[in-house]
Amino acid sequence: MKMLILIGPEGREADLRELVARHSVHAYSEFRNVTGEGETGRHLGTSVFPGRSVVIFTVVPAGRLADLKAALAEFRKGLYAEEGVRAFVLPVEEML
């Protein structure tokens, strides 16, 4: 099992949910109003550094990961340069 963490711009959460749903992933958690700084700049939800992010994470069988990564790469092609979407994959040792 692998944990897939997606971080993207606020306003794209429905697109990210749809992306994982198309790959039969129906269990996820979502954090909204996330602030931070990365390659696309600061997103602090202020007038000086506008914008916020959304974080969606899910646990998937390792066998589904390649298809999800390919779909994410295709999704990223349609984004504006300032709309960075990142994905992180972590091993899941155990689910309780």
Where are these regions (language model features)?
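Positively charged, small/polar-rich N-terminal and surface patches that mediate targeting and assembly
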Residues: M1-L96
